[in-house]
Amino acid sequence: MRVMIVEDQTMIRSLLESYFRAEDGYRITASLPGAKQAVEVCRTNSVDLILMDVQTENRENGLTAVRQIKAIQPKIKIIVVTSLIDCAVLDEAKRAGADSLWYKDSTQKRLMDVVRQTMAGEHIFPDAPPTVEIGMAKSTEFTKTEL
């Protein structure tokens, strides 16, 4: 399976690459820091799966890229990856045409499960963002406006 990773943080991008290299059947065809680059690569290259960060290099919007990629290559499966805890990201990812969403604070096993399920035609979206600590409080203790 041909995989593209779109993530602006070099360390996270390298970690995601290592996850796929550790599994049989995956080949990383592109690993990019920017969403615009991903759209261009999809115009000329065959890709089966994309892991797309919500906000990439130069503040490029990954969800905009999801829309553009789905318009030119609708069969490509796209998993949005994010660390944002905003509930709106879930809805925006669905509206953009993403096939699934995975939170970066989750495990390698969970990511690979989401990949397998997505490639099997399932759509995996968490019911809610993860709970994170913000100072001495938890994110669930704040309103959407306060977050």
Where do the model's predicted regions map?
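C-terminal output helix
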Residues: 88, 106-115, 119, 123, ...
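Conserved phosphotransfer microenvironments
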Residues: 51-66
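Two-component/phosphorelay signaling modules centered on CheY-like receiver
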Residues: 10-30
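Helix-turn-helix DNA-binding segment
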Residues: 132-147
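Acidic, metal-coordinating helix/loop segments flanking the phosphotransfer/catalytic sites
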Residues: 31-49
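Conserved acidic carboxylate
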Residues: 7
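Short amphipathic alpha-helix used as the core "switch/output" element in two-component signaling
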Residues: 40, 63-75, 95
